Amino acid sequence: MAELATIARPYAEALYKACTDQAGVDLNGATAWVDELAAIAANPQLRQLADNPKVTGEQVFDVIVGVARSALPDLAKNFLRTVIDNGRVQALPEIAAQFRTLVNRSHGTSDAVVYSAFPLDAGALTDVGATLEKRFGRKLNLSVQLDETLIGGVRVVVGDEVLDTSVKARLEQMKAALTA
């Protein structure tokens, strides 16, 4: 894992610099297409295709661009060609994560994953978001994932910080206290 992070860092930094150096490039839009490319590159069939010595880089490029949901800007195409030409398709998910970290740092925000036992409606998510932003002291980009094992409550992961207010966590704390 550390090796992929080391490989991905220069690509993420170069992409960030290219996005900030060019006028009119929306960092949030760039984050969206980088995440989309990463999701495509994470597909095992695509990785197998990219690793096949009989398949050219241009063929891999055409497949990825063809699978992408939206038209990629020229910057994205140039970036993708560079990654493919250097044989780093497997590093795209890590490149996307590091690029997102750079963008978040520049905006003073962080990504937060809210694990909930039940779906959260927009109003509840807004309330949770406001509370979490006060708790963590920064603006958060929330994403919600369902985890029925929590029984109730939420578990929030922001970087390496975890806030667990789930029923499951409380039950485990009680169990530990009773068996101690």
From Swiss-Prot:
Cellular compartment(s): Cell inner membrane
Entry keyword Transport: yes
Keywords, sorted A to Z: ATP synthesis, Cell inner membrane, Cell membrane, CF(1), Hydrogen ion transport, Ion transport, Membrane, Transport
An annotated Gene Ontology molecular function: proton-transporting ATP synthase activity, rotational mechanism
Gene Ontology CC: plasma membrane; proton-transporting ATP synthase complex
Record-annotated disulphide pairs: none
Membrane topology value: Peripheral membrane protein
Pfam families hit by this protein: OSCP (PF00213)
Gene3D superfamilies, sorted: N-terminal domain of the delta subunit of the F1F0-ATP synthase
Role noted for this protein: F(1)F(0) ATP synthase produces ATP from ADP in the presence of a proton or sodium gradient. F-type ATPases consist of two structural domains, F(1) containing the extramembraneous catalytic core and F(0) containing the membrane proton channel, linked together by a central stalk and a peripheral stalk. During catalysis, ATP synthesis in the catalytic domain of F(1) is coupled via a rotary mechanism of the central stalk subunits to proton translocation. This protein is part of the stalk that links CF(0) to CF(1). It either transmits conformational changes from CF(0) to CF(1) or is implicated in proton conduction.
Assigned protein family: Belongs to the ATPase delta chain family.
Subunit architecture: F-type ATPases have 2 components, F(1) - the catalytic core - and F(0) - the membrane proton channel. F(1) has five subunits: alpha(3), beta(3), gamma(1), delta(1), epsilon(1). F(0) has three main subunits: a(1), b(2) and c(10-14). The alpha and beta chains form an alternating ring which encloses part of the gamma chain. F(1) is attached to F(0) by a central stalk formed by the gamma and epsilon chains, while a peripheral stalk is formed by the delta and b chains.
Name of the protein in question: ATP synthase subunit delta
Organism in which the protein naturally occurs: Acidovorax ebreus (strain TPSY) (Diaphorobacter sp. (strain TPSY))
